[in-house]
Amino acid sequence: MTQTLSRITRREFAAIAGAAPLLAAAAPTLAARQDEVAGLYGRSIVIDMLANPGSMNVSWPPRGPLSEKQRDAIRSSGITAINVTVSSDFEGSVRNIALWQGEADRYPELLSIVRRHSDIAAAKQNKTLGLMLGFQNTDMIDRDITRLDMFYRLGIRIVQLTYNDRNYVGDGCLEQANGGLSQFGREVVARMNALGIAVDLSHCGTQTTADGIAASAKPPLITHSGCREVYRHPRSKEDRELKAMAGKGGVLGVYFMPFIGPGPGAPTVEMLMRQIDHAIKVCGVDHVGIGSDLSTMPIEETPEYLREAKAFVDGRAKRGIAAPDETRPLFIPELNHPRRIEGVVRGMRQRKYSTEVIEKVIGGNFHRVLKEIWTS
């Protein structure tokens, strides 16, 4: 230290000494900004329209009852409610619904099942994580539309019409034929509208997305996707699709996936902010939200996780449902923590968005539209 100091000239020393008061003055300002962001996040209804309290995408840690680390992440997340995927085949879907209802019964101070709109505000008040049970496919109903009624009674409130491939309802985003909504699909949408189940078009192909928007009498949702104009990716949506969705009162949830910007590395906060900026420009401030597509617990890139991640991607490729960029890290490193949506607040504040707009994007818009959708 003394040797380094001896090389500083008087002029340099004076400059450093003069800067010291400025640095000292800046520290409280930075702290105040951090407190303001934390306060805004803490008092807002925060909704992640695709997340999971356990493992998400990659099955590591192994799926099952919540671990202590996963429960700690839920407590610290500050998230009010999430759309948690329970879809599988018929038996698997019933089993997954029972699993999460069992976890909510086991940890009532931590989790609650969202069945009606008022349950979201109750989750905020009671400081529980509200679980909105949802499907990312319609395979479990096969061609029996009455199963929608059964699953509604079991607690399903959000249903994505297709995954990446084709089913009886329509075409997913990786289907080259790009067929639209089938006649059965139109009947499914009508029944979902009547029951009060949200129509989700996130993974749907371009034509099925357009048809789903047109067919739905209730606001259609795109719970976890992005803007194709910002980064060309089949899992994201064209501006015309986003405008049509917003025109029907729907909301887009911007995801945190590597599909938001160019690789080969991990996605970044800047990429996410560009997506949010563009979505607001195209859709308007009342039609943009968050759908991270992540677990509430941070991803730890252990050898076990990396092994399972490779198996996950390889398995999807063999089934023909793997999207481009899936070999990249499936998370934003700077936001790889339970309070990741607080990072969105910080990023939007740095971009000079107002408090009102930030509150809408981190949960207010989805909270509003779900009231309209779930009122049968």
Regions found by a protein language model. Name each.
Residues 170-264:
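Active-site core of metal-dependent hydrolases
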Residues 5-23, 28-177, 232-376:
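N-terminal hydrophobic targeting/anchoring segments and the immediately downstream early-domain regions
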